[in-house]
Structures are given as C-alpha cells and as structure tokens.
C-alpha cells in the first residue's frame, strides 16, 4: 500500500510517517508532498492508496487539494491530520469526502484507530 503524506512542514511529514509505523503499519510505501499543488502531481505520478493531508498549507490548502482531487475524478481515501479541529472544519472535510480529521497532537493509538479501516 502507498500512503501520501502532505504537509508544508518537513518535520511534521516525518512525524506523521513515523507515527504510521509506530501504529503498526510498517512496510507500507510512504511518499510526501509539501502542499496541495505538489500533492496533485504526486497523486498522478505515484497513484497512492491513501492520502493524509494537513489543512493549512501555502499555494493550495488541504481542503482545496481535496476539492481538486474530487473535480479530477480521483476516489482515493483521504483524511486530514492537522493542528486544529473546529466543527466547521469537520463539516467541510466530511462534505468534501474526507474519511476523518485527526487533530494534533495525536498518538500512535489514535493513528491506528483512524487508519485501521483503510490500511491492511
């Protein structure tokens, strides 16, 4: 399985990747992108099976990225891993087709719980 991690912070991309492994999902191929615009190109080239995206990023936000994926006809399971979680954000994410919104800080157990339905 290939997982795309999208975050403008390199450190956060590494934390998310490490937490995926700590949650028991070792051996999966993890690819990265710095923002939604770059992530769209990675999706086309790498064809990930799951996308984990930050919400607030320069150039193209996470919700704009999700909207662009939908507009281009991609049907890839998508979840947000972001620093805040308001009711409005959760509603917007759900309406856009996101499967979950995991707010930072999160634990390996939190990651295992949300990814369990998507990652074997």
Language model regions located:
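Two-component/phosphorelay signaling modules centered on CheY-like receiver
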Residues: 10-31, 96
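Helix N-cap/capping motif at the beta->alpha junctions
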Residues: 32-41, 62
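Short amphipathic alpha-helix used as the core "switch/output" element in two-component signaling
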Residues: 41, 63-74
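Active-site beta3 strand of CheY-like receiver
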Residues: 46-52
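Active-site residues of response regulator receiver
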Residues: 54, 82
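Receiver (REC) domain active-site loop signature in two-component systems and cognate sites
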Residues: 57
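Alpha4 helix (beta4-alpha4-beta5 surface) of REC/receiver domains from two-component response regulators
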Residues: 64, 85-100
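C-terminal output helix
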Residues: 106-115
